[in-house]
Amino acid sequence: MGAMTARARTFAAALTSVLAVTACSSTTQPTPVTSDSVPTLTTEVVREYDRGKDAFTQGFEIDGDVLYEGTGLEGSSFVRRTSLDTMTELDRVDLPSDLFGEGITVDGDTLWQITWQDGVAIARDRDTLAEQRRVNYDGEGWGLCTQASADRLVMSDGSSTLTFRDPTSFDAEGTVNVTLDGNPVERLNELECADDGSVYANVWQTFDIMRIDPETGAVTAVIDGTPLWNSMSASQRGGADVFNGIAQIPGTDRFLVTGKYWPTIFEVRFTDTAPVGQN
């Protein structure tokens, strides 16, 4: 996209949100992606956590016993720390009203937070969320995660491309194009760098999560999150936006997943068979 004024960006974001909510609330849901070459997995719900509908979730990550979350929309963006044990908010910092927050990730003592079309990455203290410095980058910012084994950050920009960045300078160090059956997978959104080296990515305006080999860009599994949306009541779905937010619980095979303005965080496993009672 070309340059936009703050008012135009806010209007575009609001319109996008309305369209996304309409799409998700429609009786015609997005059709899950399928492939003959990679497995389609589903979600086994282990536990559900209730929360308010105040979070336009853009970044979602667990470090130790803390859940970090970054949210979006100009004038409403914030980043917060939440206790993983009690799901109570520990700290919260609002972004300046002209910034549209996007993905977040923790690397060492630093929490990185990117922005949508502002070209600004903010380095924060992991424990206090205090801003330490800012770095400029080109293009849009959508999702972000830390691949510690490779000493790099992985960033999405809404296309099929993942960009690798230096965790200290935030300089771009390379890219990979994400493909499924040889075709590019566009609209990659929130990211999670998992313990096994895979990168998980929400696909915007769908209930799909792609499991990606970051070395080749090949999708190795497609996860269908539709049952999570279907499990919520009509009142829970009211005002809820798109599926977005993946955070692995360290050292386990479980993940926390949610969506923008979703009132529920789901603790799930990704399995190849739907548990009895889920559809």
Where do the language-model regions lie?
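Bacterial signal peptide processing site
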Residues: S25-T28
